[in-house]
Amino acid sequence: QGAEYEETRDAGLTKLEEALKYVEETGVDCLAVAVGTSHGVYKGEPHLEFELLDHLSKEVPVPLVLHGGSGTGDENLAKAVRTGIQKVNLNTDVSEAGKQALREALASTEVHGSGKDEFTPKKMNLQQTIAAGVAGFQAELEHYMKLFGSENRW
């Protein structure tokens, strides 16, 4: 977990032999690899093992997944994708963006929407509240899609 990152990071790094054996024995269609990220909020600075990731991506015959991508930084994440990661999990970053967008909408005094859909934060209904949070999620996801070169791709 992120809180113990500095103490536990190296012990759990993926070993090529174990990864190959696991993929062969289980028949999984993708593999989450440990290359220096951690779930949750980091205590300390994340240090990804790009050499290990490069080696794994060349040898492991299934797409690689990066868990704990939140808080890793755009530069590290973009490099991880260029080095072989094909799926990045970013729940904390996306959730926080949604919560922050909702906080901002509720604290705002602006009129939102237009015509019959016009509302102020004090008169937001449930759907409008949800929409404010979803807008934050969407903006964060769009950021990552552009960062990873996934924009306008299916």
How would you describe each model-predicted region?
Residues 65-67:
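Structural detector of well-ordered beta-strand residues that form the stable sheet scaffold
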Residues 70-71, 93:
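Short, surface-exposed acidic/glycine-rich loop or hinge patches that mediate macromolecular interfaces
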Residues 1-62, 74-83, 90, 97, ...:
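Alpha/beta enzyme core
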Residues 76-154:
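C-terminal alpha-helical cap/extension of soluble enzyme domains
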